[in-house]
């Protein structure tokens, strides 16, 4: 009986070793399937300046004050002030005409990587931290699902008639973009030495502490810029910088993005006409 059991056990061991050897041979014979070339994800290449300049521009509107003004106000101030009723009419007209607001990340992706945009894109920007941009402008925009970019002059935060830190945080948390606009609105063309730290770095750091998000976009006070400013702005990680209606720089189009001021004298028809005529097709 013992001999029979030993013989059976020996047979089992031989069979196990044979199967294991066969399985190992099968594993060795398996050749991985070749990776198809069209499934290899390649790194996107960035468009050069010439390519960016050829792209159709997105209309970008620039607002400052949203408040009534008297008949005796100067022509200059009329360029920076829009009646609340006029602003409301402009937002409704944009919505009724099929426009969709976009944000700077979308604009950057479109310009640099040929990313998609809605059929009728528009960008709404607000300069200088005025409180009514939050209490009137943002409220009106929310009716239509619109989002905006708020360029914050940090010296004004928490001052009368300007936004508080809490309001800025609320705008950011609700899907709008908070961006840089210097500390005290001095022209970047006049900066020297420590000015770059005071006007660019510290405001960027403060706004990041308020929003909890990177500050990646910037607007030049008065729309004025020079090559030194572009270099300093790029060195601080800004992806786009916005001017006003002057031509884009042929070598740095991402840092000379054009906008048009919306003056208090415009009708909605005038706004649409300016959007059509001010940006390339």
Protein language model regions, located:
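Sec-dependent N-terminal signal peptides
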Residues: 6-14
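C-terminal motif of bacterial Sec signal peptides marking the signal peptidase cleavage site
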Residues: 16-18
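Charged helix-capping and loop-helix junction motifs
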Residues: 161-168, 195-199
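Acidic (Asp/Glu)-rich catalytic clusters
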Residues: 138-146, 163-180
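Short beta-strand and adjacent tight-turn residues that come in two discontinuous sequence segments
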Residues: 151, 181, 241-243
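Histidine-centered divalent metal-coordination motifs
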Residues: 64, 181, 185
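Residue-level marker for buried hydrophobic side chains located in beta-strands
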Residues: 124-125, 178
């Amino acid at each position: 009986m013992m001999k029979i059991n030993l013989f059976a056990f020996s047979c089992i061991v031989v069979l196990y070793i044979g199967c294991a050897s066969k399985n190992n041979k099968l594993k060795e014979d398996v050749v991985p399937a070749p990776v198809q070339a069209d499934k290899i994800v390649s790194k996107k290449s960035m468009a050069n300046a010439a390519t960016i300049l050829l792209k159709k521009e997105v209309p970008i509107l620039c607002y400052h004050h949203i408040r009534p003004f008297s008949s005796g106000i100067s022509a200059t101030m009329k360029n920076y002030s829009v009646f609340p009723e006029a602003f409301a009419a402009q937002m409704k007209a944009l919505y009724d005409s099929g426009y969709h607001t976009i944000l700077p990340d979308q604009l950057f992706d479109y310009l640099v990587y040929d990313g998609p945009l809605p059929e009728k894109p528009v960008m709404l920007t607000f300069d200088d931290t005025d409180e009514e941009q939050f209490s009137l402008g943002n409220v009106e925009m929310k009716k239509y699902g619109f989002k905006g970019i708020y360029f914050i002059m940090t010296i004004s935060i928490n001052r009368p008639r300007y936004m508080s830190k809490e309001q800025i945080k609320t705008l950011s948390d609700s899907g709008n973009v908070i961006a840089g606009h210097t500390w005290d609105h001095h022209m970047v063309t006049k900066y020297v030495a420590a000015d770059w730290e005071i006007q660019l770095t510290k405001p960027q750091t403060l706004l990041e502490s308020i929003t909890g998000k990177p500050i990646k976009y910037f607007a030049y006070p008065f729309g004025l810029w020079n090559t030194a400013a572009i270099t300093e702005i790029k060195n601080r990680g800004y992806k786009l910088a916005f001017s006003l209606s002057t031509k884009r720089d042929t070598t740095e189009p991402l840092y000379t993005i054009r906008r048009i001021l919306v003056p208090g004298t415009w009708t909605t028809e005038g706004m649409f006409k300016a959007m059509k005529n001010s940006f390339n097709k």
